[in-house]
């Protein structure tokens, strides 16, 4: 039985993010890396998350924190609403909403992630949290106001 990819692509996991998470392939661009990293959170794969963080970030030191977080978080969905990169610059950005429940409460991470390409491989560097007004449209694309959607 085939399983849809957790990244929200509507493609089977085996044909979408699995080749990246399993190490068969390297993500070709920041959006694919972002989606595969989301899958790694869903599948509780700390090794892939650490491997795809830029080495300068010292992600290996976060292993215990990542694993502890897996036990309390259920990921509900990912919406990528903007992505841009130029291979010539070796830098890219992906803006997304990742929805989750933790301790019985629903939440969302809204982030503009920054990626760097080195030696043919994209790495996650860091992210910023954009500010939205309570009455702004929610960036997840629901059509609702931010305060009634991901801003709760």
UniProtKB/Swiss-Prot annotation:
Gene3D superfamilies: 3.10.450.50. SUPFAM superfamilies: NTF2-like (SSF54427), Sec-C motif (SSF103642). Disulfide bonds: none annotated. Pfam families: SEC-C (PF02810), YchJ_M-like (PF17775). InterPro entries: NTF2-like_dom_sf (IPR032710), SEC_C_motif (IPR004027), UPF0225 (IPR023006), YchJ-like_M (IPR048469). Belongs to the UPF0225 family. This is UPF0225 protein YchJ. It comes from Escherichia coli O139:H28 (strain E24377A / ETEC). The gene is ychJ.
